[in-house]
């Protein structure tokens, strides 16, 4: 994980072509950031609102005064979602199969669970991109076709049903997340989350309370956490019920609005 520009030296970004691999595009961004810094544009901001303590701490490291930052998590209207504490035998990966999302580590974990009845479902399909083809090649070479299911793009009632019947949601990210909607959405459905111990995920997913945390990029450790759902009867229900309760307490619309209004009035 690169934090080379965190303390204001943006020139390293040019060397790494951080803007979509474009040196010219990155150079323009660096010029803009240096200009913002020179004219002290952030000094004119009255207050910054972050969605998690992790992001707040990164802003502080980057030079923003702590007194100008508050943490207000995003919200979900859990009243519109009926939790389901029953489940079918599958783990669910939600979202795009981008490198930073760590999809490959969820797939690798299934090598250790070949002898179980559980499968990994991925809400996406294998595209013609080099990255997706490499993932599919890995699935084939390791004979995981019956353990890894690509469901294709899902939305609406189909997606709701897919989440509702999952044993848990898997978030194997290898890059910092801000406040993943996937996590609080899973909580609203009464589903525990198994996530990398990194960034805000390690903050939002409370280990052994609302889900389980594993070492980032460690597919064996992830498999061990998933194995617990195979062998520990009631684990998904117990963690899922805690997740739903915390969702209603910490990530509700009312809680969010109260915090925002308090900041605006201060």
Where are these regions (language model features)?
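Acidic donor-binding loop of glycosyltransferase active sites
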Residues: 164-178, 191
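Carbohydrate-associated surface elements
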Residues: 54, 75
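A conserved mid-protein helix/loop that constitutes part of the nucleotide-sugar donor-binding site
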Residues: 89, 98-112, 133, 212, ...
């Amino acid at each position: 994980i690169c934090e080379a520009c965190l303390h204001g030296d943006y020139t390293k970004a040019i060397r790494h072509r951080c803007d979509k691999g474009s040196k010219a595009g990155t150079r323009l961004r660096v010029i803009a950031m240096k200009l913002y810094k020179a004219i002290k544009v952030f000094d004119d901001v009255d207050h910054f609102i972050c969605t998690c303590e992790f992001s707040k701490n990164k802003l502080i490291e980057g030079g923003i005064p702590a007194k100008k930052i508050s943490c207000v998590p995003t919200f979900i209207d859990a009243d519109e979602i009926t939790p389901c504490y029953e489940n079918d035998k599958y783990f669910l990966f939600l979202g795009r199969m981008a490198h930073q999302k760590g999809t490959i580590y969820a797939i690798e974990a299934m090598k250790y669970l070949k002898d179980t009845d559980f499968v990994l479902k991925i809400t996406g399909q294998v595209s013609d991109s080099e990255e997706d083809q490499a993932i599919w090649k890995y699935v084939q070479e390791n004979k995981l076709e019956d353990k890894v299911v690509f469901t294709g793009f899902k939305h609406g009632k189909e997606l709701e049903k897919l989440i509702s019947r999952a044993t848990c949601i898997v978030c194997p990210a290898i890059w910092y997340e801000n406040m993943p909607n996937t996590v609080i959405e899973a909580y609203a459905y009464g589903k525990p989350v198994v996530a990398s111990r990194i960034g805000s995920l390690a903050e939002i997913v409370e280990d052994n309370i609302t889900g389980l945390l594993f070492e980032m990029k460690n597919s064996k450790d992830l498999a061990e956490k998933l194995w617990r759902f195979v062998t520990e009867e009631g684990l998904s229900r117990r963690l899922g019920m805690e997740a739903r309760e915390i969702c209603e307490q910490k990530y509700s619309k009312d809680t969010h609005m109260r915090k925002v209004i308090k900041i605006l009035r201060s």
